Regions:
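Hydrophobic transmembrane alpha-helices and immediately adjacent juxtamembrane helices
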Residues: 1-281
C-alpha cells in the first residue's frame, strides 16, 4: 500500500513541480534590460571599435577647428561655442539615426531579420528599444567627445545635466523617427546604404537652420532643438526658463516625427511581407 501510494504520489508531485516551473512570459522590461545589456557587452568586448569612433569624431572636429582658424581667424574664435554645441548635437544625431537604419540594414545582410519577426513583442518594438539602447550609449560617447572638444578649444559651456539631457534627447528623438523610416525602406529595397549615409550630412543644414529668420524651419527635425540647445549651453538658460510654447513645440516635433517614422516602418515591413521580400537579400 505504502509503496503504491508513494508511486502514485511521485508523478503528481512532479506534475505540480512542472507546473510551478513553467517559464513566465517575458515583458517589455525584460526586453529593455536585454538590449541594454547587449549594448554594454558590445562596448566591453569591442572597446577598440568604440574608441575608434571617438577618435574619428575628434579628428573631424580638429580638422574643422584648425582649418577654420586658418581661414576665418578671429571670426571663428568668436563663434567657437556655437560650433562645439552644433558638433555635439550632430554626433548625437548621427548615432540616433544610424542606431535604427544601420542596425536593420545589418540584420538584413546577416539574414537574422526574421528572428525579430517571430518574437512575441513584434518587429517594431524590438527595433525601437534597440535604437533607444544605442542612443543611451551614444550619449555617453558624445559626452566624452564634448569634454575633449572643450579641452582642445579651451572654451567653457554651461553644462546643466538635466536641461542638456532633456533638450538634446527630445531633439534627437525626431532623428530616431527618421531612422525608423530609413530602416523600413531598407527592409523593402535592401541596398540603399549610400542614400542613407547621405542623409547624415543633411543634419548639418538642419542644425544650423536659421530658425529666427525663417520661423517655419522650427518644425523640421533638429532645427528648433538645436536653437534651444545653443541657448542652454552657451547662454546658460535652464529648462524651466524656456517659454511653454517652445517646450511644447520641441515635444510635438519629437513625437510627431517618431510616430511618423514608426508608421512608415510598419507600412514598409508589411509591404515587404506581402511582396515576399522580407528575408530576401
Amino acid at each position: 500500500m505504502s509503496a503504491d501510494a508513494s508511486r502514485s504520489d511521485g508523478p503528481t508531485g512532479n506534475g505540480h513541480a512542472a507546473v510551478d516551473e513553467e517559464p513566465r512570459p517575458a515583458t517589455y522590461y525584460h526586453l529593455a534590460r536585454a538590449v541594454l545589456y547587449r549594448e554594454y557587452l558590445i562596448f566591453v568586448r569591442y572597446p577598440a571599435n568604440a574608441i575608434g569612433g571617438i577618435v574619428v569624431s575628434l579628428f573631424f572636429f580638429a580638422a574643422l577647428f584648425l582649418g577654420g582658424q586658418l581661414l576665418a581667424g578671429q571670426a571663428l574664435t568668436d563663434s567657437i561655442e556655437g560650433i562645439v554645441v552644433g558638433y555635439f548635437l550632430w554626433t548625437l544625431s548621427v548615432g540616433a539615426y544610424s542606431s535604427v537604419s544601420n542596425d536593420i540594414g545589418s540584420e538584413v545582410q546577416w539574414g537574422t531579420l526574421e528572428r525579430h519577426i517571430t518574437t512575441p513583442f513584434g518587429f517594431a518594438p524590438v527595433a525601437l528599444l534597440k535604437g533607444i539602447a544605442k542612443v543611451v550609449r551614444t550619449f555617453l560617447t558624445s559626452a566624452v567627445i564634448l569634454a575633449l572638444m572643450l579641452v582642445i578649444t579651451g572654451t567653457q559651456l554651461s553644462l546643466a545635466p538635466l536641461t542638456v539631457v532633456v533638450v538634446a534627447g527630445l531633439s534627437i528623438t525626431s532623428v530616431l523617427g527618421l531612422g525608423f523610416a530609413a530602416g523600413g525602406v531598407t527592409v523593402l529595397y535592401k541596398q540603399i546604404g549610400n542614400w542613407l549615409n547621405l542623409l547624415q550630412f543633411g543634419f548639418v543644414a538642419l542644425i544650423s537652420a536659421p530658425v529666427f529668420d525663417l520661423p517655419w524651419t522650427r518644425v523640421l527635425p533638429l532645427a528648433h532643438g538645436s536653437a534651444m540647445l545653443q541657448r542652454v549651453m552657451v547662454d546658460g538658460v535652464r529648462l524651466w526658463e524656456f517659454p511653454l510654447v517652445d517646450l511644447a513645440l520641441l515635444v510635438a516635433v519629437a513625437v510627431g516625427y517618431l510616430i511618423g517614422g514608426y508608421l512608415v516602418f510598419e507600412y514598409a515591413t508589411a509591404r515587404a511581407r506581402r511582396l515576399g521580400v522580407l528575408g530576401d537579400y
